Structures are given as structure tokens and as C-alpha cells.
Amino acid sequence: MGYDSQVRTKKRHRITVVCTNCKKRKSKCDRTKPCGTCVRLGDVDSCVYLTDSSGQPESSPSLNDADPLRKQSTPAERISPGFIKKRRSSQTRQDEDHWQRVRELENQSSLYYLPIHEETPFFIDLIPSGFYLETKRSADNLFGLFTDRAIENRDPYLQTMVTFRSIAIKKMMDKLGSNGNNVKNGSLPKSFEALSTFDADDERHISDDVVDKGNNFRMHQTIHKSLFNKFAQYRENNAKKFSSETILAKDYLPPLKILESEVLALFEEKIYNMIPIFDMKILRHEITIFYQNIVEKGNPVSIKHYDHMVFCIILLIIKICRLSVQFSKLTPYIYPVLQEIDTSKFLALVKHYLFETKVLRKCNLLQLQCLILLRFLHWCAPEDGDGPETQYCQILMGTIISSCKEMGINWYCFSHPEKYSFKINRHTRPSYDIMKPSDYISVFRKIWSYVLFWDRKMCFISGEECQIGKTLQCHFKEEADTPTWYIRMLTLDNLMKKINDTLNDDPGKVDLNLLHRLINDLKRNFHILKSLSKNEKETMRHFDFEMEWIIDLFSLSLLHGEMIFYEYDCNITKFYKSFQDLWDMVIHISEKCYNYFFNSDALEVDSLTKFYTNRIVEIVANKVLVIVPAFILRGDRFKTIQYADKKKMIEFLYGVSSVYFNEFGFEYYRCFRKMFTAKIAYKILNRSCEKNAWRIILKFLLNELKLEDNGDSYIDYNDMRLKDICPIILEFQETVQKYDGYRPDILSIWNNEFYPIGKYNDDMTGFKFQMRIKEMQEFLDMEKYSDRFNIFSSFYDHASSQLAKHTEVDTNISITNEQVAETPQKELLQQPLAPALPVNDLIVSEFDVIEDIFDPVDFVSFF
């Protein structure tokens, strides 16, 4: 088929007898100018009639026409929701050229052809180990496909390492507890007990070391205690209880003049576009009424008249604005009054008032706006609102979505706005004299587009299924001045929903080729949208920044799942390619993180919006820390990855960890608590050439299974058994037991028999792993924290010297049952089967391994 035949025939620009708005809405038009319907809906400026046949297309083509097999759209889908905007009175030649280029891009994106191998479905399994569900005292969670837990559960190397780590920590806790060294902090969760206990034991060791008594130790002790106290205070403040009768609004709020001049001015200028769910004129009116009736007169906050919801909205806006200034790292002389406001009890006050209403039964506009502000605060705040893996956000988000649907905030406010018939009662707040039906439609549109995008966003971040199950196909218009960035993103919603459906309809059978096509379409169409927003470039950069990072994060998580599938499937060529692609993606994302922290001016992100952008950067950087150990543990399987290359990977892990925890660990509770396991993972992997970490892990867990079978395991009868927690080790044990009295090296069994992809030589495919040393260099030469306290490596010199002594002694010991290979890649194929050790000897042996890796001295302040 020739190119000319592929181009869509342009329609004639016919003269219309009704205005273009009514034609698109399919509503009645009285044919006046402006028509009555447009006057009623506030679309006066865009009420136009076509009177010539200029040959221009009647409407811009849909971004979603790339799918040639899609069904005929319904009338609702043919409507252009939310994009009937004010038309400029005239356009310059430059603008006409710009829109011509946009049309060309759209036509190209809707008519491209794919290679036949990309059109053919190719299915992969993203849940080879099943879904990951965790139950505990306070919550039950099914983790999304791309959360840390799900990634670790999918990857046999990470799953085994995490299991080993948890058992080792438990054994060390039991050992320290037997000495009466357990430490508890009532304001911190039970999961912090191990952190506090390790830390207290380390302080006892170091306080006895004369060498370490000095400024460094005192500085460490001060910083460490302040962090524990700060995060304990977070939880204590958020758990505070109030009595409605004793709450006086004036005790928490600044004077109205300061609120308007500093807080609301900052909110409207810098933050409102992030959460555009208000009509600011109406909001200011409600705040003024609240101050007049409650603050100035000293009246109690009325729940009946919904004063408490206005109060909560004010509290949340103040707290969000304060976060904006706090994380901007600007001089304290900017917004000084705002920084002096004590917001520590605000979240507890909001939660108190929210549950004074029937929040689980019915909802009004103020209450919904309060819930959305709370959701936004959970996302941005340093407290642990969403959970360490965003696993606690769905319940609040589900409440918001259900409330929206109950209130009529849905796709209809875009597709059929003229069909809304309001009855506004006299006691409604905001009242009818300040908020008319057209204002409701406008606010409804803002809220729905915002809630919709956040629902789709969480699918890309954690892989969880979208809660909003409907989408409409939206079209570009020739004007870029849509009310909000979120409304503009409606043109991408159909693609984002398709990606969600492809991923979550059957995670065990995901069409990878279709997913790649959809992601490429999303990137291309998002690029077009960015070109349309050229007039708002200054105020929208943080949104575009976040969207780009979200797409990168999704691609990273998908690549990891793809690599695991090829590994299980023994697809050698594709496994090697995905292994390299995943590593390249890790390096690329790490570079972006580095630039965010140390070259932020080049990113052109407003410093007052960093409290918002920090969150996506923190999630992405953490994902790198989760995935990098998977490369290090697999390194021995590749002929082209030498021990020196593994050391570079470990140095890279150390560099990324240092940046992540030094930039976020001091402020964010969720990052602080991850430091413990991250430090242990680093200690596990940072082994000498003679001490292969993967061999240690496998032997340890096989011994633990033997102890479990003999009834001598440390595991309490209420705990799950190792064979249930990590079934792959039980399967591996069965494979090892096939060798009766004579067996190969344990790594040979794993690589060649149990996990057979390892038996294929790199020479068979010509694979040569590219380390990308040049791109890693910033993290290998980690000097950013050499002149100040490095929270990740505190007292690391002392710990390293202790570890070096152990290594030196172990290296000089004559090994009779196992010969040490010259390099990790050269494995012994056969060796005598070592006799089984007595149970007591096994326990001693295990503690030797644990103490070698987890010497408490290594965890001064690493909890």
C-alpha cells in the first residue's frame, strides 16, 4: 500500500447552521450568536459558526486512531470532553505553523505500521511465584505487581536473599534478646524493635572503644537519637486524640490577613495547579466567613454547619504550603511567618473531624475536597501516610472515587454537562449565592480529571489495578489553554487505561508486544501534549517531570518482569538482551536521580515544587536499590562478568544508597526505616572473592531447612515455615538430595540442574555484558559526603577493619571439604559430599556466618 493511499481524506469545511459547540454536544441550538446553550454553559467565546470551505479538517484527528481495529466509537466517545475552550480572536502565522506541525504529528502517529513480529501477541508471566499477600496484626495487603515485595517475590534470587536476611535478623535478635538487650520505643511500630536493638548494642560496643570516642561518635550519637525521636514524634502527633468541645480554631490558625497574604498567595501561585480542585474565589469566600464566625468571635467549630470541613481544608493547605517551603531549601527569611506555624497536630485534627461525619455513608463537596487534600498530603509528607510501598493508599483513594460517583462527579460532567439538573438547597455550603450550577460543573470537571489521573498514576507506579473502570476517547483541540494540566491529560487516559487492562486482566498472561506498543504511543502522545503546553511551560514543568519519571519507572519494572520470564523460560538470547537492557535502564535512571539532587537547576523544576517531585524520585531511586542486588547475585553465572565487575556493581550500590539515604533518610520516615535492610543487603553482597554471597545464602537456608525438619529451628510454632515462605529453597533441597554421597558444587547444581539457564555458555550467543563504567562514574567516586556526615556509612571504617580481620583469618584456614575457585566463574563440578553436622554444630556454624556478615559493629545507627 502506497503512502498516499494511507493518508486520510480530509473532509470539506461545510457551512454549519448550528454552532460548532452544539454540533459536537449534539444539543439544541437557537442559531443566534452566541446561542442560548453556549451562554448557559459559559462557552460564549467559543460559540462560532463555520461559514467558509477553507479545506481545513473539521476537527483534529484522535490520538487513539493508531489502533486500526478499534470498534466504532459511541456518541459519548465522539464528544470532545473538556476541550471546548475559548477561541483566540486571531492567530499569528507562527501559531498556524505550530498547529499545522501538530496535525502532521498526529497523522503520523495514527498511520504508522509495525513490523509483523511486533503485531503478533507475545505473552509473558509476571507472577511466576503467584501474587504476594501479606497478613499481619494491623493490616492485610495484596501488593501490586510492581511494588518492592512483588518484585522480590517474582525474582528467585531476591526472594532467597530477603528470606535469608529476615532469618538472620531474627537469629541476631534472639541472641541479643537472651542477653537482655532488646530495646523498645512505644511511639515507634514493632518493626522498629530490631533497629533500636541493633543500634543500642552497637553503642555499647563503640562506647568501649577508646579510638572511637571523639567528635565523630558524639555527632553520630546526636544525629541518630534525633532521628529516632523525630520519627517517634511523627507517630505520636498523628495519634493524638481531641475532644471537639476543647478545640479552639484560633489556637491553631494565623490571623486572616497573614493567611491571605502568605499562605493562600503561595498556595494559589505555586501549589494550586498541583491540586486544582477548588474555585479559589469561592474558597476564599468560605475561609473569610469561617474567620468571621468562628475565629474572630471565638465560637466553637460547628459540625452541623460544616465549619469543621472548612477548618480542615485551611489546616491542610497551611501544612502543604509549609512543606513546600521546608523542602525548597530556600532561605528561612522567605515566608518567615509560615515557617513559624506549628503544624505538628494538624493531621490529627483533620482525622478527628473527618470521622465526626458520616464519611462512610455520604459526602458533600467540602468533605470530598478535604479527602483529596488529605490524599495529596499523604503522598508528599515525610510521615508514613501511604506506607513504604504505597500499599496503604487504595482505601482512601477508593473512598474518594466512591464519593465522586455518589456526587455525580464522573465522565458525564465532560460528555453531558448540559444534562445536569441541579437543586441547590438553601443550607448547602457553599451557598447558592456564591456557587451556581455552572460553577459546580467547572469544579466537578477539575476534580474528576484530577482523581482520574491519580488512579491511573498509581497503576504505573505500583502496578495496582485502576479503580475507575471506564474511559472515554478524547481529542486534541487547537487551543492549549485548558483549565488544568489534568484536564489536558484526559487525551492520554484511553491509552493509560489500555495499559492497565493489558497488565492486570491476567498478570500470568500479559501481551508484551501490545504493552510495548501502548507505552510507545503514550510517550509519543505525551510529547505532543508537551508541545501544546508551550505557553504554560514555566508553571507545568513539575507535572511533565513527574509524568516522564512515571513512564520510566513503569518501563523499569516491566523490564525486570520480562527478564525473569525469559530466565524461567530458558530463552537465552532474550534473557541476555533483557539483562543488558535492564542494567542500562538502571544506569539511566540513576543518572537522572543524580542530576535531580546535584544538577537540579538544569532540570528547571521550581524549588517550591520539590516537596511534590521528591516523592516520585524517592520511589524510583528505591526501585534501583531493590533491583541492583539481583545483578550482583547473578554475576557468577556470566563468563564476561569478572569479580572486578561485581565489585564495581557493589560500589555502585553503595553510591546510590549513599545518595538516596543522605538526601531522603533524614526527612522521610519511610526511607529511614528502609535503611536497616538496605545496609544488611549491602553487607551480604560485599563479600571477598573467596566468600561467594550466593553460596553462603544457599548453604544457610539448606541448613535451616534441615533444622526445621529435625524440629530444632528457631521458628516459633505460630510462624510460617521456611518451606512455605520460600518454596524455591524446598525444591532446591529436593534437587540437591538426588546426589547421594557424591555431588557437584552447590552452585553447579543451582545453575545447571535446578535453574538450568545458567548452564549455557556466553560464547553460544556472543553475549558480552556492557558495564557502562563511564555512566556509573558519579556513583563510583562518591565524594559528595566526604566532608560531612554520611548516614549510610557511619562508622564504616571501624566495621570494615573488623570484617577484614575475619576475612584474613578465614582465608588462611585450610579448607578440606571445599576448594576455593580462583575466580567466581570457575566452579568445581564434583566434590565429596560433606558429612552432616550435628544440630548443635549447625547452629554454631550459622551464627559464625551471621556474625561475619551482620556484626553489630557494622550497624552503628543502622537500626
Swiss-Prot record:
InterPro entries: OAF3, Zn2-C6_fun-type_DNA-bd_sf, Zn2Cys6_DnaBD
Polar residues composition bias: residue spans: 52-63
Assigned GO CC terms: mitochondrion; nucleus
Molecular function in Gene Ontology: DNA-binding transcription factor activity, RNA polymerase II-specific; RNA polymerase II cis-regulatory region sequence-specific DNA binding; zinc ion binding
A GO BP entry: positive regulation of transcription by RNA polymerase II
Entry keyword set: Cytoplasm, DNA-binding, Metal-binding, Mitochondrion, Nucleus, Repressor, Transcription, Transcription regulation, Zinc
SUPFAM superfamilies in the cross-refs: Zn2/Cys6 DNA-binding domain (SSF57701)
Residues annotated to bind DNA: 19-47
UniProt-listed Pfam families: Zn_clus (PF00172)
Signal sequence region: none
Top-level taxon: Eukaryota
Main location: cytoplasm
Protein location: Cytoplasm; Nucleus; Mitochondrion
Keyword DNA damage: no
Annotated segments matching region Disordered: 52-99
UniProt KW Transcription keyword: yes
Record-stated family: Belongs to the OAF3 family.
Function: Transcriptional inhibitor with a significantly increased number of target genes in response to oleate.
Name of the protein in its database record: Oleate activated transcription factor 3
Organism taxonomic ancestry: Eukaryota, Fungi, Dikarya, Ascomycota, Saccharomycotina
